[in-house]
Amino acid sequence: MPRRRSVEARKILPDPKFGSELLAKFINVIMVDGKKSVAESIVYGALETLAQRTGKEPLEAFEVALENVRPTVEVKSRRVGGSTYQVPVEVRPVRRNALGMRWIVEAARKRGDKSMALRLANELSDASDNKGAAVKKREDVHRMAEANKAFAHYRW
């Protein structure tokens, strides 16, 4: 633990097209090897496809999809007297967004469609309909937390 003041989080610049900090963060999650322009073209292409498919604004459709993937509780391992318990804890808002984005990207990369933009569009579309691999991941995490509710008093 540092003894000095805590470091404030860096301010992230909003994305150039929609002016959303959340979308800028998502572009950074998609980015591989520092190729931001490639990541931006993938995300914007996916959002265009998603907007045509749903008939909503691209940013609104993205936020609905992300909201359906965000976890509210997760389990953390806690060692008590020689045995390890999976203790359910509430997820902080920043981590909630980060996990949701990471799960969407992982699920999109595992899909078998042609381009990454198409895979991402399909995963976001599934997430906004409350189905798909990313939503399944959230359900699994919630199920684990529910199953280990008895150990909630070990919270720290």
UniProtKB/Swiss-Prot annotation:
Keyword RNA-binding in record: yes
GO MF annotations, alphabetized: mRNA binding; rRNA binding; structural constituent of ribosome; tRNA binding
Instruction: Report the transmembrane regions from the record.
Output: none
Q: Which CDD domains match?
A: uS7_Bacteria (cd14869)
- SUPFAM superfamilies, per the entry: Ribosomal protein S7 (SSF47973)
The record's section on Pfam families has: Ribosomal_S7
Q: Which domain of life is it from?
A: Bacteria
One GO biological process term is:
translation
Q: How does it assemble?
A: Part of the 30S ribosomal subunit. Contacts proteins S9 and S11.
The protein depicted here goes by the name: Small ribosomal subunit protein uS7
Taxon lineage? Bacteria, Pseudomonadati, Pseudomonadota, Gammaproteobacteria, Pasteurellales
